[in-house]
């Protein structure tokens, strides 16, 4: 059985009619709170702002055509009424060369240069724990589901759709990875059901990183790779 087939067989469709599509700039208001919810602690440390300000920044950055927060990197599950139910980002390591440039511009534009300096320094610390994807990798990030839809299988169905449509490779041609907080046992269990396995840690954790941001990198279909 292929990896895609295994995921499809293991994950039922959500109870209500759901469709899946690439995100658009018009989804910014709906997706920004979900993107924030995918990493409340991480964004709080990185941006050093209130939840409201973090979400406002993400909403603006989501509307951009460029960078890691752009709508062009995201896929969404939507209900019959068009409401966004779940979101995920797909970062291709072969196309992230200028991500840092775009995030500097986005931060300076929203928060101002003085605030941005501290944010960039904290971002460097965070990246020691959550590294950008290598050129050989595709990083899945910003995985979140509307709280009213959690437990319905909608995110799993969104992930499955990304495999079936080719938005994510399911044939092992690229290494698909994601990061999950060590303390987020529920999310890790979900990713394991989807076929992700934890990778051994190969880097020393920064002393400047808060303990609650300790993370595990996982790889899709890792048990089939050398």
Named regions from a protein language model:
Residues 76, 83-92, 139, 144:
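Conserved beta-strand in the GNAT
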Residues 94-138:
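Conserved acyl-donor/pantetheine-binding loop and adjacent beta-alpha core of acyl/acetyltransferases
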Residues 39-62, 97, 109-112:
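Conserved GNAT-fold acetyl-CoA-binding loop/helix
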Residues 51-74, 79, 129:
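Active-site rim helix/loop that mediates acceptor-substrate recognition in acyltransferases
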Residues 19-33, 44-45, 92-93:
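A short beta-loop-alpha structural element at the N-terminal edge
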Residues 1-26, 216, 220-226:
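Conserved N-terminal entry element of GNAT/NAT acetyltransferase domains
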Residues 137, 172-177, 181-188, 192-194, ...:
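C-terminal "cap" of GNAT-fold acetyltransferases
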Residues 145, 151-165, 189-193:
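Conserved acetyl-CoA-binding loop-helix of GNAT-fold acetyltransferases
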């Amino acid at each position: 059985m292929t990896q895609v087939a295994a995921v499809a067989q293991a994950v039922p469709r959500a109870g209500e009619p759901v469709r899946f599509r690439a995100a658009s700039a018009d989804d910014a208001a709906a997706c920004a709170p979900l993107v924030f919810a995918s990493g409340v602690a991480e964004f709080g440390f990185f941006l050093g702002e209130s939840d409201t300000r973090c979400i406002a920044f993400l909403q603006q950055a989501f509307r951009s055509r460029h960078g890691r927060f752009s709508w062009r990197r995201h896929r969404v599950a939507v209900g019959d009424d068009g409401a966004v139910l779940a979101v995920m980002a797909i970062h291709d390591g072969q196309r992230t060369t200028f991500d840092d440039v775009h995030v500097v511009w986005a931060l300076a534009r929203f928060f101002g240069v003085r605030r941005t300096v501290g944010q960039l320094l904290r971002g460097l610390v965070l990246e020691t724990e959550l590294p950008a994807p290598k050129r050989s990798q595709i990083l899945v990030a910003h995985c979140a589901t509307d709280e009213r839809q959690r437990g319905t299988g909608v995110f799993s169905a969104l992930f499955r759709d990304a495999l079936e449509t080719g938005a994510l490779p399911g044939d092992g041609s690229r290494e698909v990875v994601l990061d999950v907080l060590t303390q987020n046992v529920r999310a890790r269990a979900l990713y394991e059901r989807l076929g992700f396995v934890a990778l051994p840690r190969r880097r020393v954790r920064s002393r400047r990183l808060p303990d609650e941001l300790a993370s595990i990198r996982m790889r899709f279909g890792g048990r089939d790779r050398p």
